[in-house]
Amino acid sequence: MGKIIGIDLGTTNSCVAVLDGDKPRVIENAEGERTTASVIAYTDGETLVGQPAKRQAVTNPTNTLFAIKRLIGRRFEDEEVQRDIEIMPYKIVKADNGDAWVEAKGQKMAAPQVSAEVLKKMKKTAEDFLGEEVTGAVITVPAYFNDAQRQATKDAGRIAGLEVKRIINEPTAAALAYGLDKKGGDRTIAVYDLGGGTFDISIIEIDEVEGEKTFEVLATNGDTHLGGEDFDNRLINYLVDEFKKEQGIDLKNDPLAMQRVKEAAEKAKIELSSTSQTDVNLPYVTADATGPKHMNIKVTRAKLESLVEDLVQRSLEPLKVALADADLSVNDITDVILVGGQTRMPMVQAKVAEFFGKEARRDVNPDEAVAMGAAVQGGVLAGEVKDVLLLDVTPLSLGIETMGGVMTKLVEKNTTIPTKANQVFSTAEDNQSAVTIHVLQGERKQAMYNKSLGQFNLEGIQPAPRGMPQIEVTFDLDADGILHVSAKDKQTGKEQKITIQASGGLSDDEIEKMVQEAEANKEADKKFEELATARNQADQMIHGTRKQMEEAGDALPAEEKEKIETAISELEEARKGEDKEAIDAKVQALMTAAQKLMEIAQQQAQAQQAQGADAGAQSKDDDVVDAEFEEVKDDKK
């Protein structure tokens, strides 16, 4: 069996490693660098990858693609993709299937297709070093990548001519690299991985029994749209805003200038990790009728920290959730490991140390640890490493939609993979001949708030009263974290299977909502209380509106009366149901319908007040001096 290489396919940089003897070794690329920029450029008849692509970016911004990992497995409509469209110099377009694709040199390409160019370079780098063809690889992904994003990463490998032997989570890979040669018994480590575009936290237990090491992931959490690129964008926006204040020119409309500012911002950010201030100096950045314009802006470390403080803070929330899911406190953590280039920022290191109450380990290379761990896993799969067992987990719960729009979970989040789970369901109506299996990923009880991974039909069910047929649904989650689903009619033996295909990524907001609201969904009492409150509000609204209608009498036009009566009867109908959202919507609809009634009630109240007012008030107006006034509109409301 040939060598299985380990590849860290990063947002900003990628790295390849291989097992050399019993130790992982990072391989230098053709340019002599240990990491390769994840930048791809399309020029006339040539595709450039890495440093050569980065070097020509200033003169070819619209055909130079970077941070493609932020788009992999995502839908065009995703909020994060829409945000990226505004800041990326290249074109992000909507594919026929709704995915986010890119366009360069007039050609539309899928994200896995572009990422495959980076993987091809990694493959070639390894082949040049080993002197033989390489076909097998272990590729890493952020722990919080969903099914679609994992599938898309596997597709990229296949396009690059690689057989992807395993997809493993980046923090887990880093733990493998770190713990492989560590002696001294059991330890519980926290891997804080802040890369170019994604953030993960994993709590991992390393057990050693008679020389065999088990790496067990206890919990994982993260944010698939938070990373160094976001830090860069904050600094880019600051520089552009400062330049606009000084020169009155908006550089955002100039792709060439923006590419120069991007490079300068990235360089300044790196410099500010080791110095307290730096100058961003870009001569001839643009020009207008008065001549050329130069950018010269001083940036201090304190300024940069103030620009990104909320991003660092955002990374701390998943730490709390991961510890709670692992049922541990900060005192139970033996070692803290920092992975990803953005963790070189002193502020990030300080905040993480403050959170865990201990300094992070300094003996881990944040740019290389993930690829080295992937190479170790490659060695395990190739049979070169015998004494290592890796137990990873699924980051989000998996289930299907059942009657009433409820998500029934078959696999809970943080379940060790591979895993298999099955459950028997039945029909919702008499003589139902087919069922639709709607597969979901997420933590919400209501199906509509989770990520839809796909659906399929099981047909040919024999006619029977509802609840009688037995349909067994099986979820098979493989070691790559990719889901295979089957549904079987136990009476007829008819079966339908699918492997969930990439249909788009999870948005940050969706993930955030899933985590935050997961706890709330466990509390049936809370749900009941909310429903009761909604019903009470509906009752009050109906009673109050009817009372106002009586008082308004003939002042309310007949068509308005009819509109309100319709809204009241719709609210009364919704009130009988169990759907709080439906009740709230109908309350809102009644408020809208009763707007005219509110105006009449207000006019009647004002008329009554006017009757009782002092008739002599008019004479006082003679002494009043007219004043000019200006209406101030508050746009923030």
From Swiss-Prot:
Biased composition (Acidic residues): 623-637
Keywords from the UniProt entry: ATP-binding, Chaperone, Nucleotide-binding, Phosphoprotein, Stress response
GO molecular function, one term: ATP-dependent protein folding chaperone
Induction conditions: By stress conditions e.g. heat shock.
Residue numbers spanned by region Disordered: 600-637
Entry annotated with the keyword Repeat: no
SUPFAM superfamilies in alphabetical order: Actin-like ATPase domain, Heat shock protein 70kD (HSP70), C-terminal subdomain, Heat shock protein 70kD (HSP70), peptide-binding domain
Gene3D superfamilies (alphabetical): 1.20.1270.10, 3.30.420.40, Actin, Chain A, domain 4, Substrate Binding Domain Of DNAk, Chain A, domain 1
Comp. bias regions, Low complexity: 601-618
Residue(s) carrying Phosphothreonine: T198
Keyword Chaperone: yes
Name of a matching Pfam family: HSP70
Domain of life: Bacteria
Function: Acts as a chaperone.
UniProt record similarity statement: Belongs to the heat shock protein 70 family.
Protein's name according to its UniProt entry: Chaperone protein DnaK
The species this protein was found in: Vibrio parahaemolyticus serotype O3:K6 (strain RIMD 2210633)
Gene expressing this chain: dnaK
